[in-house]
């Protein structure tokens, strides 16, 4: 398993941001902090969901660190990455992504299952198996979908906000009392 040492040049080449100060990035190394920064998928609406995404990112980083010493194939064509990013942004988990190996369209959920399979051993090592398992649920029913379902009922966005506040704050806190709305 990865040791957490400084990334090799092969590993750094897999990260697409030229410098830590670069503004337009998906994943970038932050050597000053010893971290990897990732542009997050939709804002998560519960701490459990945040932990699931963090577990996925940790396990993926561990997978990639392990692969850094393997010369393997060159990074994929930027056009393929851009197309898949567009498809995912437009269609979410309903997207048909382009498989880098076969060039065929593959449901995003199948791609996710492959990724989770690759992450399983790393999640065990990182002790985040329980959190990683939540990613499957998020793929099918995430916070954005829950918010849309709440809003579609009566269209009251204040109720959506109240439900979000309730997901974060226990019902006995002053914050909850301040957001009490008849929904």
Feature annotation, model-predicted:
Residues 1-183:
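C-terminal accessory/tail domains of diverse enzymes
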